[in-house]
């Protein structure tokens, strides 16, 4: 007897799958407010990109790629005298374009369609934090493009994207004043609200306020600040900034080692 190929021939009975997902909850009071999640960084991961970097911070995974410099869109612009250090005048400075995308499988909850308002806001924050560190005057009439892809959102996604993007720019050989290191913070609610460094996704969802700090560690200059929510008095926000800057300084050696390892791999590959 011929079978009916138009029907789904599944089993007559089914059983619900067992859930073995890791429990991200922490017992109240056991969380060290200054702890950083384990970090793994690798530069030069993509062979087809001018520069690339992959970063893991706990459950957060970000992949960044850099392309360019290439001629900026909009045609030729008029010339002018060169500035100090051989840089182009302000009117001819290069441009830094940033794109932030979230993979469909990045989080448990369904997100807005790609290219939505949230992704555009994060891309703009990425651009504003990276621009102070890049010597755009050395790339007249050109544009550099940075693409960040969030593979898994385990918390502090913007901070991880900032760090990975700066690492990718350095891997591409782009002239920079300094690297940019990002750190996220969240204000845990309760009778005695406490700022938590490098929060997880669940900690961000429960937080009364959030803050992302971007630091150029060698120059000791803040490249960007982005806060939201109700963080209380000014002293509370100042404490959060101080905690975030300390976290950025602690992450900086990890990026240095990643760039050194990438340079050694390139040197070994270039040898006959």
UniProtKB/Swiss-Prot annotation:
Its main location: cytoplasm. Pfam families: RNase_PH. One of its GO terms (biological process) is isotype switching. It is found in: Cytoplasm; Nucleus, Nucleolus; Nucleus. Gene3D superfamilies: GHMP Kinase, N-terminal domain (3.30.230.70). It comes from the Eukaryota. One of its GO terms (molecular function) is RNA binding. InterPro entries: ExoRNase_PH_dom1, ExoRNase_PH_dom2_sf, PNPase/RNase_PH_dom_sf, Ribosomal_Su5_D2-typ_SF, RNase_PH. GO terms for cellular component: cytoplasmic exosome (RNase complex); cytosol; exosome (RNase complex); nuclear exosome (RNase complex); nucleolar exosome (RNase complex); nucleolus; nucleoplasm; nucleus. Component of the RNA exosome core complex (Exo-9), composed of EXOSC1, EXOSC2, EXOSC3, EXOSC4, EXOSC5, EXOSC6, EXOSC7, EXOSC8 and EXOSC9; within the complex interacts with EXOSC1, EXOSC7 and EXOSC8. The catalytically inactive Exo-9 may associate with the catalytic subunit EXOSC10/RRP6. Exo-9 may associate with DIS3 to form the nucleolar exosome complex, or DIS3L to form the cytoplasmic exosome complex. Exo-9 is formed by a hexameric base ring consisting of the heterodimers EXOSC4-EXOSC9, EXOSC5-EXOSC8 and EXOSC6-EXOSC7, and a cap ring consisting of EXOSC1, EXOSC2 and EXOSC3. Belongs to the RNase PH family. This is Exosome complex component MTR3. It comes from Homo sapiens (Human).
